[in-house]
Structures are given as C-alpha cells and as structure tokens.
C-alpha cells in the first residue's frame, strides 16, 4: 500500500485517534528510509496496525534500541485486515487484531503461538484482562493484549442540553435509540460508526435481546429499529466524526472513547473549546481488546517477538495510552498514564460500569452474513 503521508491523511479512516498531520508524518517517516547501499541490511520487522494507533515516537525508539528496521503499514477496517491475513503471504510479522477475530484466525491456522520464553515483559500484563481474553484465545496462547476500550456516546454537552434540556439522557442509549430524542438532535447532526459488529449488537442489547444472538429473527427486529432511526443519521463513518465533532458539524456520535478524546483535543487546538463528553450508557456497552499477534508465515519471527516484548514494557505502552486516551492491559503501566486520563470515567470505567460491559464475540458464518445484510440494509435505508 502507498505510504505517502499526504495521501494517507485523507484516504484512510482511523480506528480511533488523531488526524493531525504532524503525528501522521512522524509515524510514517519511521523506518522507511532505505539503508545505504554499502551497509549490510539490518534485521527487520513488518507491523500491520490500525491507522495512527500507536504513540508517534514508539517505532523510532524501538529501532534505535533494538537495532531492528521497522516497516509500519496500516489498515482502514478489520474486514480488510482479516481478508489479507486469511489469504496468506501477507509479509507481516506482527498484527494488531481485535479479540472477536481471534477464534477464526486461530482456527484457520493463521496465527503462531507466542514463545513466552522470548517475552519476559509478559509478567507486566493484568491477570484479569488475560483471563477475559481466554474466551477468544484459550490459555492466552496467541495474543498479547495491547489496548482496550469501549463503544459509547460522544456528544457536545452544550448543544445537546440546549435541545433536550438539562435532563437529557446523556448516560443512556435512549439519547440515540429513542426516536423522539434523535429526531430533535438531528438538527445539530448525529453520526454512527460504520461498524456492523458493534452497532448491531448495541441495537440488539437495547431491545433486550442477546447482543451475540444466533437467531435471524432477532436481527430483523434490530433492523426495524435502526431503519426507524436512519432518517435522522447524517452518516455512518468511523473516522469523519472526529473532525466533525471538533468543528461542530455534528453534536452526537455513537463512537469510540479515544475518538471523542481526540475531537476534544482538536477542538482546543483550533480554539473552539467545545464541551465534548464521552459516556458509557448505563444499560451496558461493548468492550473490546486489541492484541498483538504473530503470523504463522511471518518472515521475521524473532524480530516480531522482540517488538511484542518491547510493547509490553510499562513505559512504552503508557506512551500510547497517553497519546490515544485508551487504557492498556499492563498492570504496571497504570501509574505512568497521565492522571487526567486515569481520572476520566469514560476511559477508565469504575468497577460498577465494567460489570455492565459486554465483549464483542465471533458469530457463526451464517449469522455473520445475516448481520452484514442487516447493516447494509440500514446504511442504504432500503
């Protein structure tokens, strides 16, 4: 794929984070310069990650410390990534993958078991998060948890309360899924992620149905609900909401915590100083964990393990948490995360809130197709 920063800035959606040019340029300038012809080639590692989903200095620091040349490519959505890995011969050593994708990747023989003897920094990982990951990765054999987060509601507090009043249900999915509220909020713009594996489970959960339902009839009910809301949604997109929330083009989004945090920072940088807030609805919301995995056909497995071990260092992963406003899975890194991030309940939920969260899970292929058709119907409004 092209790694021209000027092109990438506008052509690749973000998982959840910054869109400022300085970060992009610093990220993609790392490790891409060719070695001098008269110098022996350095060992290398090829990384495949979400766009701008790592601290901007991490790759350069790793190269300096490890003496390993790094090539860093990005993907725009998990379907693209999964398809490339399933096809084989991707050329990547380490990939960042969502927990709900792990079972299919493991079953297909795409992933390589991690050699823990080469990962001394594994000891820093949080046992509770490792235990939760075992539903998708038994015995934590294949995945080293990286960052985690939730999918909830981002909103402009001033605009929402001016429209719905001081008692606006900002801590409930009613803000979006109750049509009378959404119709009123449409005057200032409401957007949703373009993510069937997150939005459809939320709709099912809101209806009191299993979020990971295997019943096709449940998806008809979710589709009916979402189609009622469709006329009031300005667009479905997983990156545009960040700039639009920052500049006031929208006032509500069903989105990610880190994206809303970035919108607030962008707003302040532009001098808008909007009162942007992220909330985890009291009814419950999806929680996801992104992990570092190694491919079975990785061309540089030793260098891949060196990179994973580097990312498991508390000081290293804390930099990404501080940059992205996402919690990490490293129990010894928490104290290194900025206090204002740790104190944000939308980023670091309380135990009571954590108990309401539900994990994204893989579905049987037949039901996955039903969910995809449901989502496509909702997006087109047909």
Question: Which sequence ranges carry the predicted segments?
Answer:
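Extracytoplasmic ligand-binding site segments that recognize negatively charged/polar headgroups
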Residues: 96, 102-232, 239-246
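Early extracytoplasmic/lumenal segment of secretory-pathway proteins
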Residues: 37-108
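Conserved C-terminal helix/tail region of periplasmic/extracytoplasmic solute-binding proteins
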Residues: 243, 351-382
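A ligand-binding cleft/hinge motif common to bilobed small-molecule-binding domains
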Residues: 101-104, 252-272
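Short beta-strand->loop
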Residues: 112-123, 270-286, 295-298
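Periplasmic-binding protein-like
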Residues: 219-228, 234, 272-293
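A bilobed periplasmic-binding-protein/Venus flytrap-type ligand-binding module shared by bacterial periplasmic
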Residues: 154-159, 205-209, 288-300, 319
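Mature extracytoplasmic/periplasmic domains
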Residues: 290, 295-356
């Amino acid at each position: 794929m092209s790694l021209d920063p000027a092109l990438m800035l506008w052509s690749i959606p973000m998982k959840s984070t910054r869109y400022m040019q300085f970060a992009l340029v610093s990220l993609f300038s790392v490790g891409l310069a060719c070695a001098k012809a008269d110098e022996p080639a350095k060992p290398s590692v090829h990384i495949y990650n979400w766009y701008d989903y790592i601290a901007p200095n991490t790759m350069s620091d790793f190269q300096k410390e490890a003496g390993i040349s790094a090539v860093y490519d990005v993907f725009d959505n998990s379907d693209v990534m999964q398809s490339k890995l399933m096809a084989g011969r991707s050329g990547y050593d380490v990939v960042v993958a969502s927990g709900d994708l792990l079972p299919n990747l493991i079953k297909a023989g795409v992933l390589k078991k991690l050699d823990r003897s080469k990962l001394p920094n594994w000891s820093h990982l949080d046992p509770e998060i490792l235990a939760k990951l075992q539903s998708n990765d038994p015995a934590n054999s294949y995945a080293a948890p990286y960052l985690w987060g939730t999918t909830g509601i981002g909103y402009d507090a001033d605009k929402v309360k001016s429209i719905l009043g001081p008692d606006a249900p900002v801590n409930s999915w009613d803000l979006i899924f109750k049509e009378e509220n959404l119709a009123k909020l449409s005057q200032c713009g409401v957007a949703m992620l373009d993510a069937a594996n997150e939005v459809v489970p939320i709709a099912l959960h809101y209806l009191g149905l299993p979020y990971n339902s295997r019943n096709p009839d449940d998806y008809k009910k979710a589709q009916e609900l979402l189609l009622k809301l469709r006329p009031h949604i300005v667009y479905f997109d997983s990156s545009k909401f960040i700039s639009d929330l920052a500049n006031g083009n929208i006032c509500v989004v069903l989105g990610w915590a880190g994206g809303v945090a970035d919108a607030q920072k962008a707003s302040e940088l532009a001098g808008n100083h909007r009162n942007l807030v992220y909330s985890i609805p009291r009814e419950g919301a999806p929680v996801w964990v992104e992990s570092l995995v190694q491919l079975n056909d990785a061309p540089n497995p030793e260098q891949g393990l060196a990179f994973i071990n580097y990312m498991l260092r508390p000081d290293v992963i804390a930099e990404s948490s501080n940059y992205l406003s996402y919690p990490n899975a490293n129990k010894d890194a928490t104290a290194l995360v900025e206090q204002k991030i740790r104190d944000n309940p939308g980023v670091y939920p309380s135990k009571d809130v954590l108990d309401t969260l539900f994990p994204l899970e893989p579905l049987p292929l037949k039901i996955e197709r039903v969910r995809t058709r449901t989502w496509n119907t909702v997006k087109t409004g047909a």
